[in-house]
Amino acid sequence: MNALALVKTLFPENVWPKIWIVGGTVRDHLLGKEGDDIDLDAVLTPQELTACGFRSVDPVTSAPIWFRHIPGIGKIEVTALSEAGQLSEDIFCRDFTVNALAMTLNGELVDLTGGVRYLESKELRACSPESFVDDPLRIFRAFRFVTEVWRLIPETEALIRAKSWEKELSGIPVERFSREMLKALKGNCPAEFFREMIRFDVGRSYLPELFRMPDVPAGPIDKHPEGDLFTHACQILQRVAAATADPLTRFCSFFHDLGKLSTAPELYPRHHGHEDAGFDMARVFCNRLSLSAAHRTALSWICRLHGNAGGWQKLRDATKIRMADQARRAGIVRILPLVAAGDKPDGGRMPRWEEAVRVAGMSTLQVGIERSRLEAMPVEKRADYVLQKRIACFRHAG
């Protein structure tokens, strides 16, 4: 069911003329895409909205917001207008013309900014010269559109280049930036988000690590002909994005070499110990960006384990089992092989990885250890004894 048909089922027919689908919901509808949420403008009373299952979130604002969540569909958000004339005010205050569209429940399009023209050409034009001044985070939203193969028109580029935005951005919660970044990682070409940040020199206060990457060698030139760390990160992200749509995996792939930023320049182009350095840096990095514990744990362990993962076939069985156990506990069992393959497309294969993970997760009973024998053993020898049993199971299964 498309957005238009769904909205009709939520309201009685007599109020349909007072409701408009707006913003990205209209954009996605015209592009034939399924959106995550549905945005509406409506000249409805609190009583009418309550009767339709909506609840008020901020009843003291001039344009109160009402929500309803429908399982399996998502969030429906209604901006309550006091009169129909406010629709045009809402439209002109939006970020881009392709998001400044409205549609009646009869399917009539309201296009006051020429948004359809830019929608057809997949070009991004700001609704007004003040669009980014009103909310500088819209710059990162523009970059996010680029990951979906949209193009910034010259006028939009000029508005972004018109000034330095770091002072304004410093007053905006980092969570808002992180949300845009994580959404961008879902795009068809996620590396474009970071390329645009560097191209326009915007976002240093949020991601200072990103802006250092172009000046750091990825490694010895015979192993990294791409040269710098930023180019290397973009290449890996592109490869991983071709293999999975999972944004957490893509995030880990782009920042897996975070530890190389700690290398002293006199040691370039080598980065000895960058895996362990990245483990510690990733925690600070993710905390600063207010990312989830899952992001923090996954990136930390990807930083630490990706080097060994790239040389998986040369590892001793004991190291393989320990690695598999660490990956299992960190929740990166599926992520690590993809990052390893992206990092070394010609040699990052990890044969029998799933078997190693299975064995690493086996209980002492499953590997044939009697409880009484384990309890009779000195505590300091138990872990190694269990490991040897798991190694035997791994070899036997092979």
Regions found by a protein language model. Give the residues of each.
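Catalytic cores of the polymerase beta-like nucleotidyltransferase superfamily
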Residues: 1-398
